Structures are given as C-alpha cells and as structure tokens.
C-alpha cells in the first residue's frame, strides 16, 4: 500500500553503505519503504579504501580524538554543509520529504518517520529543532532519536550542536523562539538502552561531558530537562530499551518502537 516511509540515518561509522538494520526494519514493519541517505566522512572512506569520486563529504574538521571538537559548520550530525559546498545534510532530508510528498508518486503515503541511532540519533534530535520538516497535507511526519552521544540543549549558550550558539548556515537565521516552537509541536521518540554506559565512539568534549558520563546518563538528564517544560513534554515520548547496550539492531527490533512507527495519531 505504501502508507509508511522510514528515513533511517546511519551512525558515526557509516556513510558508505546502507546501515545494517535497514533490511531488518523493512522485514519487521512489512509494507514500508526504508530510505537511508549517506553522509560519508573522509576518514570512513579511507578506512574502506574508497576513492574520492566527487560525492559529498562531511566533517573534515573533526579528528579521531573524541575529546577535541571540530566546527559545527561541516558536521553532518547537526545540519552542517558538505565540505566546500553550501549543501547541508538537512537539505538532503528536505529534498527527500519534498519527493515523498509528491502525490503522483506516493498517493497512499500517510506517515514518514525520520529515525536515527547513535550519531543518527543526534542528527534527528537536532533536525526536530531546526529542520524545515515540510510535507503535504495528509502525511504525518514524526521522529525517533535514539542513543545519541549528545543532545541539543536549547537553553544553553554552548556552541552548536550542544547548545544553540554558533549555528551552521542551515539554521543560522532561526530565532530561539522558532527553535522552541519546533520542539514543542513535533512528536519525537527519544530512546536509549538501559545498558548503554560504555565509551565506544562517545563524545568526550567538554560540552558533551557536562551532559553526563555516558549515553544513558545523558538520556536521563535530557529527560529531566524536557519534563520541566510541559508543552515540550507533551510531544516527546521517552522509551528505555531494557537490557540493551549500544546495539542499533536490537533497538530497531523493539516492539514499542515498531508500534510507534506504525501508528498514525
């Protein structure tokens, strides 16, 4: 029937091939399109011996040292531009949404879920705040941001993507009121595994460490922040993946998440 589309955003080590949970999610949900845009980094292409062939590449300013931040302006996780371009990682999602909103191509489409895990969860959480999020009437657009290394704290003057200072081109001209307006009207599931307390690929920059010692602690602290704002909390669903560490495939197979993706409010 083509009533559901999931746009799946890969993690920090992805960007050169479809994410591993893509086919598993497609099988679990049944009649669904799963679309997975890629945001490669030069480091990942070198790791897999992939030559630079003209494709867009992000994050040249970010080193392998997880205690040292790069610039937000080339970081795909927060809408930064591909190196040497004015194409934001969020522009790609906007183009996908425009394409999916074409009634002639997808006449039965009722719901789109932008979902991401780990670095993909960072991407989604920030798109909720600043993304255009435009779809045609009759399509519900919802979000699932899972197990991110860090969260956007809209009440913080820290640099993007931890706070709202020094935002990249895509969201530079937005006001704080617009950002909070998006957060208070867009439905998003935030999830994290109860055992996600390891340090693999964990952001350890000073701004990140202020959010907590590990992903699960940061998730709990973010939940407490959201619950202080009743209008924001009304649109947020928090879900703890029981007995799961940092394991994307297990999270995407979680029955609660699958139900969230399928249901149309």
Predicted regions and their residues:
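The feature captures the conserved acid-bearing segment of alpha/beta-hydrolase catalytic domains
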Residues: 136-228, 246
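Phosphate/oxyanion-binding active-site loops and adjacent basic polyanion-contact surfaces
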Residues: 82-94, 214-219, 248-253
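Residue in the alpha/beta-hydrolase core beta-strand immediately N-terminal to the catalytic nucleophile
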Residues: 111-113, 142
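Gly/Ala-rich beta-loop-alpha elbow adjacent to hydrolase catalytic centers
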Residues: 116-124
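Short beta-to-alpha linker loops that shape the active-site pocket of alpha/beta-hydrolase fold enzymes
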Residues: 38-42, 149, 244
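Extracellular/periplasmic catalytic domains that process cell-envelope and extracellular macromolecules
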Residues: 1, 26-30, 106-108, 119, ...
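C-terminal catalytic histidine-bearing segment of alpha/beta-hydrolase fold enzymes
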Residues: 191, 203, 223-265
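Serine-hydrolase catalytic machinery in alpha/beta-hydrolase-like enzymes
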Residues: 3-111, 122
């Amino acid at each position: 029937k083509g009533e559901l589309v999931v746009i799946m955003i890969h993690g920090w080590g992805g960007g050169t091939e479809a994410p591993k949970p893509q086919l598993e999610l497609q099988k679990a949900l049944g009649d669904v399109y799963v679309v997975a845009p890629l945001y490669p980094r030069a480091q990942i292409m070198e790791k897999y011996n992939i030559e630079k062939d003209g494709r867009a590449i992000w994050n040249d300013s970010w080193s392998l040292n997880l205690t040292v931040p790069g610039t937000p302006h080339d970081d795909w996780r927060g809408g930064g531009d591909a190196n040497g371009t004015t194409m934001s990682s969020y522009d790609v999602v906007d183009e996908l949404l425009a394409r999916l909103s074409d009634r002639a191509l997808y006449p039965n489409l009722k719901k789109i879920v932008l979902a991401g895990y780990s670095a993909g969860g960072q991407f989604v959480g920030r798109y909720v705040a600043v993304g255009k999020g435009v779809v045609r009437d009759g399509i519900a657009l919802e979000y699932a941001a899972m197990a991110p290394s860090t969260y956007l704290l809209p009440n913080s003057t820290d640099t993007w993507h931890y706070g709202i200072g020094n935002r990249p081109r895509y969201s530079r001209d937005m006001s704080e009121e617009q950002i909070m307006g998006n957060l208070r009207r867009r439905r998003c599931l935030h999830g994290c595994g109860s055992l996600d307390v390891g340090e693999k690929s964990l952001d350890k920059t000073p701004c990140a460490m202020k959010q907590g010692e590990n992903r699960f602690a940061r998730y709990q602290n973010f939940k407490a922040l959201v619950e202080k704002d009743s209008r924001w909390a009304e649109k947020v669903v928090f879900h703890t993946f029981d007995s799961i560490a940092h394991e994307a495939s297990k999270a995407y197979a979680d029955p609660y998440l699958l139900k969230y993706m399928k249901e149309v409010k």
